[in-house]
Amino acid sequence: MMPLAEAGALAQGGGPSATEWACILRRKTPRHKQPTLLMVRASRRSGKTSAVLKAGRQSVSGRKNSTSKDLVTLGASSLREERGHPLHPRHRKAVHLRTRGRTRGWVQTLARMSRRTRGPVERAAAAAAAAAGGDAGHAPFPPPPAADGARAPRSPGQVTPRGLRLRLPRRESLLRGLCRPLRPLLGFRESDSAKPASLRLLQHTPSARRNYRIAGARLMRSNYPPPLSSAALRGAGPTRRN
Protein backbone atom coordinates (compact mmCIF):
# COMPACT_ATOMS: atom_id res chain seq x y z
CA MET A 1 0.00 0.00 0.00
CA MET A 2 1.04 3.57 -0.61
CA PRO A 3 1.76 5.64 2.50
CA LEU A 4 -0.77 8.34 3.37
CA ALA A 5 1.75 11.15 3.11
CA GLU A 6 2.82 10.05 -0.37
CA ALA A 7 -0.79 9.58 -1.43
CA GLY A 8 -1.65 13.05 -0.21
CA ALA A 9 1.29 14.53 -2.02
CA LEU A 10 0.24 12.83 -5.26
CA ALA A 11 -3.36 13.96 -4.77
CA GLN A 12 -2.25 17.56 -4.26
CA GLY A 13 -0.18 17.49 -7.46
CA GLY A 14 3.19 16.79 -5.88
CA GLY A 15 5.58 13.88 -6.40
CA PRO A 16 8.05 13.25 -9.20
CA SER A 17 7.58 15.06 -12.47
CA ALA A 18 7.07 13.45 -15.90
CA THR A 19 10.78 13.64 -16.68
CA GLU A 20 11.66 11.94 -13.39
CA TRP A 21 9.09 9.20 -14.07
CA ALA A 22 10.62 8.64 -17.53
CA CYS A 23 14.10 8.33 -16.02
CA ILE A 24 12.81 5.88 -13.40
CA LEU A 25 11.07 3.71 -16.01
CA ARG A 26 14.13 3.82 -18.28
CA ARG A 27 16.35 2.58 -15.45
CA LYS A 28 13.98 -0.21 -14.49
CA THR A 29 13.22 -1.45 -18.02
CA PRO A 30 15.99 -3.33 -19.89
CA ARG A 31 16.79 -2.24 -23.42
CA HIS A 32 16.36 -5.63 -25.14
CA LYS A 33 13.99 -7.67 -23.08
CA GLN A 34 13.77 -11.30 -24.13
CA PRO A 35 10.19 -12.67 -24.09
CA THR A 36 9.47 -15.04 -21.23
CA LEU A 37 7.94 -17.63 -23.57
CA LEU A 38 11.14 -17.85 -25.60
CA MET A 39 13.19 -18.18 -22.42
CA VAL A 40 10.97 -21.02 -21.20
CA ARG A 41 11.18 -22.80 -24.57
CA ALA A 42 14.95 -22.43 -24.65
CA SER A 43 15.25 -23.73 -21.10
CA ARG A 44 13.07 -26.75 -21.88
CA ARG A 45 14.99 -27.55 -25.06
CA SER A 46 18.49 -27.21 -23.68
CA GLY A 47 17.88 -27.91 -19.98
CA LYS A 48 19.41 -24.61 -18.81
CA THR A 49 18.75 -23.21 -15.36
CA SER A 50 17.15 -19.87 -14.63
CA ALA A 51 20.49 -18.43 -13.49
CA VAL A 52 22.08 -19.17 -16.87
CA LEU A 53 19.10 -17.64 -18.66
CA LYS A 54 19.29 -14.57 -16.45
CA ALA A 55 23.00 -14.16 -17.18
CA GLY A 56 22.31 -14.47 -20.89
CA ARG A 57 19.55 -11.89 -20.62
CA GLN A 58 21.91 -9.49 -18.87
CA SER A 59 24.53 -9.98 -21.59
CA VAL A 60 21.95 -9.18 -24.28
CA SER A 61 20.69 -6.05 -22.51
CA GLY A 62 24.25 -4.71 -22.31
CA ARG A 63 24.62 -4.70 -18.53
CA LYS A 64 27.19 -7.45 -18.32
CA ASN A 65 29.70 -8.77 -20.86
CA SER A 66 29.89 -12.56 -20.65
CA THR A 67 32.03 -14.94 -22.75
CA SER A 68 30.64 -18.26 -21.49
CA LYS A 69 29.77 -20.94 -24.05
CA ASP A 70 26.78 -22.16 -22.02
CA LEU A 71 24.70 -19.04 -22.62
CA VAL A 72 21.75 -19.50 -24.92
CA THR A 73 21.77 -15.99 -26.37
CA LEU A 74 25.41 -15.71 -27.45
CA GLY A 75 26.04 -14.43 -30.96
CA ALA A 76 27.27 -16.68 -33.77
CA SER A 77 30.37 -14.57 -34.41
CA SER A 78 31.63 -14.88 -30.83
CA LEU A 79 31.06 -18.64 -30.92
CA ARG A 80 33.03 -18.92 -34.17
CA GLU A 81 35.92 -16.97 -32.71
CA GLU A 82 35.92 -19.12 -29.55
CA ARG A 83 35.90 -22.35 -31.54
CA GLY A 84 39.09 -21.30 -33.31
CA HIS A 85 37.79 -20.38 -36.77
CA PRO A 86 39.24 -16.99 -37.72
CA LEU A 87 37.05 -14.49 -39.46
CA HIS A 88 37.75 -13.20 -42.95
CA PRO A 89 39.19 -9.66 -42.66
CA ARG A 90 36.90 -8.27 -45.36
CA HIS A 91 33.62 -10.19 -45.04
CA ARG A 92 33.79 -11.09 -41.32
CA LYS A 93 32.81 -14.68 -42.03
CA ALA A 94 34.50 -17.88 -40.95
CA VAL A 95 36.32 -19.45 -43.90
CA HIS A 96 37.64 -23.02 -43.65
CA LEU A 97 40.34 -24.90 -45.55
CA ARG A 98 40.75 -28.67 -45.37
CA THR A 99 44.31 -29.83 -44.78
CA ARG A 100 44.68 -33.55 -44.07
CA GLY A 101 41.19 -33.92 -42.65
CA ARG A 102 41.28 -30.86 -40.35
CA THR A 103 39.83 -27.41 -40.89
CA ARG A 104 42.11 -24.41 -40.70
CA GLY A 105 41.84 -20.70 -41.30
CA TRP A 106 41.54 -18.79 -44.56
CA VAL A 107 44.43 -19.43 -46.95
CA GLN A 108 44.76 -18.25 -50.53
CA THR A 109 44.92 -21.33 -52.75
CA LEU A 110 46.78 -21.65 -56.06
CA ALA A 111 43.54 -21.78 -58.02
CA ARG A 112 42.58 -18.27 -56.81
CA MET A 113 45.97 -16.68 -57.43
CA SER A 114 46.72 -14.65 -60.51
CA ARG A 115 49.35 -15.73 -63.01
CA ARG A 116 51.95 -13.30 -61.69
CA THR A 117 51.48 -14.50 -58.11
CA ARG A 118 51.14 -18.18 -58.97
CA GLY A 119 54.47 -18.44 -60.84
CA PRO A 120 56.82 -17.45 -57.97
CA VAL A 121 54.80 -19.52 -55.49
CA GLU A 122 55.03 -22.65 -57.66
CA ARG A 123 58.76 -22.13 -58.24
CA ALA A 124 59.39 -21.65 -54.51
CA ALA A 125 57.38 -24.80 -53.72
CA ALA A 126 59.34 -26.80 -56.33
CA ALA A 127 62.67 -25.53 -54.95
CA ALA A 128 61.62 -26.44 -51.40
CA ALA A 129 60.57 -29.93 -52.51
CA ALA A 130 63.87 -30.43 -54.35
CA ALA A 131 65.83 -29.25 -51.31
CA ALA A 132 63.91 -31.58 -48.99
CA GLY A 133 64.47 -34.55 -51.30
CA GLY A 134 61.84 -36.69 -49.60
CA ASP A 135 63.80 -37.10 -46.33
CA ALA A 136 61.10 -35.51 -44.21
CA GLY A 137 59.48 -38.87 -43.40
CA HIS A 138 56.52 -38.63 -45.75
CA ALA A 139 56.01 -38.28 -49.46
CA PRO A 140 55.78 -34.73 -50.81
CA PHE A 141 52.34 -33.33 -51.41
CA PRO A 142 50.89 -34.01 -54.88
CA PRO A 143 50.52 -31.03 -57.21
CA PRO A 144 47.20 -29.18 -56.92
CA PRO A 145 44.53 -30.45 -59.31
CA ALA A 146 43.89 -28.40 -62.39
CA ALA A 147 40.83 -26.22 -62.56
CA ASP A 148 37.68 -27.47 -64.25
CA GLY A 149 37.94 -25.01 -67.13
CA ALA A 150 41.66 -25.62 -67.73
CA ARG A 151 42.72 -28.25 -70.26
CA ALA A 152 45.99 -30.04 -70.88
CA PRO A 153 48.43 -28.32 -73.25
CA ARG A 154 48.64 -29.66 -76.78
CA SER A 155 52.42 -29.97 -76.78
CA PRO A 156 55.06 -29.35 -74.09
CA GLY A 157 56.78 -26.62 -76.09
CA GLN A 158 53.76 -24.33 -76.21
CA VAL A 159 53.40 -23.44 -72.51
CA THR A 160 56.04 -21.54 -70.54
CA PRO A 161 56.73 -22.23 -66.83
CA ARG A 162 54.66 -19.17 -65.91
CA GLY A 163 51.64 -20.53 -67.74
CA LEU A 164 51.81 -18.17 -70.73
CA ARG A 165 51.20 -19.62 -74.19
CA LEU A 166 53.89 -18.98 -76.79
CA ARG A 167 53.00 -18.13 -80.36
CA LEU A 168 54.32 -20.54 -82.93
CA PRO A 169 56.38 -19.23 -85.87
CA ARG A 170 54.72 -19.08 -89.26
CA ARG A 171 56.58 -22.07 -90.71
CA GLU A 172 55.65 -24.37 -87.84
CA SER A 173 52.04 -23.27 -87.92
CA LEU A 174 51.98 -23.88 -91.69
CA LEU A 175 53.37 -27.41 -91.25
CA ARG A 176 50.89 -28.02 -88.47
CA GLY A 177 48.08 -27.04 -90.80
CA LEU A 178 49.38 -29.35 -93.54
CA CYS A 179 49.55 -32.37 -91.24
CA ARG A 180 45.83 -32.43 -90.66
CA PRO A 181 43.58 -34.35 -93.10
CA LEU A 182 42.81 -32.22 -96.11
CA ARG A 183 39.08 -31.60 -96.40
CA PRO A 184 37.65 -30.00 -99.52
CA LEU A 185 36.07 -26.68 -98.68
CA LEU A 186 32.81 -26.52 -100.60
CA GLY A 187 33.04 -23.22 -102.43
CA PHE A 188 31.94 -21.83 -105.77
CA ARG A 189 33.76 -24.38 -108.00
CA GLU A 190 33.85 -27.42 -105.72
CA SER A 191 31.18 -30.09 -105.42
CA ASP A 192 30.89 -33.52 -103.89
CA SER A 193 29.10 -34.94 -106.92
CA ALA A 194 30.36 -35.92 -110.37
CA LYS A 195 28.04 -33.50 -112.12
CA PRO A 196 29.34 -29.94 -112.55
CA ALA A 197 27.72 -27.38 -110.32
CA SER A 198 25.42 -24.87 -111.93
CA LEU A 199 26.69 -21.30 -112.01
CA ARG A 200 23.18 -19.96 -111.53
CA LEU A 201 22.20 -22.16 -108.58
CA LEU A 202 25.06 -23.37 -106.42
CA GLN A 203 23.73 -26.86 -105.87
CA HIS A 204 26.59 -28.69 -104.18
CA THR A 205 24.81 -31.67 -102.63
CA PRO A 206 21.82 -33.81 -103.64
CA SER A 207 19.84 -32.48 -100.68
CA ALA A 208 20.54 -28.89 -101.77
CA ARG A 209 19.42 -29.73 -105.31
CA ARG A 210 16.20 -31.25 -103.97
CA ASN A 211 15.55 -28.15 -101.89
CA TYR A 212 16.13 -25.95 -104.92
CA ARG A 213 13.66 -28.03 -106.98
CA ILE A 214 10.99 -27.75 -104.30
CA ALA A 215 11.56 -24.01 -103.94
CA GLY A 216 11.39 -23.54 -107.74
CA ALA A 217 8.11 -25.45 -107.98
CA ARG A 218 6.56 -23.34 -105.21
CA LEU A 219 7.75 -20.17 -106.92
CA MET A 220 6.19 -21.21 -110.25
CA ARG A 221 2.91 -22.08 -108.51
CA SER A 222 2.73 -18.73 -106.77
CA ASN A 223 3.54 -16.65 -109.86
CA TYR A 224 0.95 -18.20 -112.20
CA PRO A 225 -2.71 -18.37 -111.11
CA PRO A 226 -4.50 -21.73 -111.39
CA PRO A 227 -6.80 -22.38 -114.39
CA LEU A 228 -10.51 -21.55 -114.19
CA SER A 229 -11.48 -25.20 -114.27
CA SER A 230 -9.54 -25.81 -111.10
CA ALA A 231 -11.32 -26.94 -107.98
CA ALA A 232 -9.85 -24.01 -106.07
CA LEU A 233 -12.19 -21.55 -107.84
CA ARG A 234 -15.34 -23.69 -107.58
CA GLY A 235 -17.68 -23.53 -104.68
CA ALA A 236 -16.81 -26.30 -102.27
CA GLY A 237 -20.34 -27.56 -101.57
CA PRO A 238 -21.68 -30.98 -100.64
CA THR A 239 -23.82 -31.17 -103.81
CA ARG A 240 -22.70 -31.21 -107.43
CA ARG A 241 -24.28 -30.01 -110.68
CA ASN A 242 -26.41 -32.30 -112.86
Swiss-Prot record:
The region annotated as signal peptide is none
Q: Domain of life of the organism in this record?
A: Eukaryota
UniProt lists compositionally biased (Polar residues) regions at 58-70
Q: Low complexity bias: where? A: 122-139, 147-162
Q: Where is this region: Disordered?
A: 43-70, 112-162
Which InterPro entries does this chain map to? DUF5550 (IPR041009)
Q: What is this protein called?
A: Uncharacterized protein LINC03040
| Lineage, highest ranks first | Eukaryota, Metazoa, Chordata, Craniata, Vertebrata
The gene name on file is LINC03040
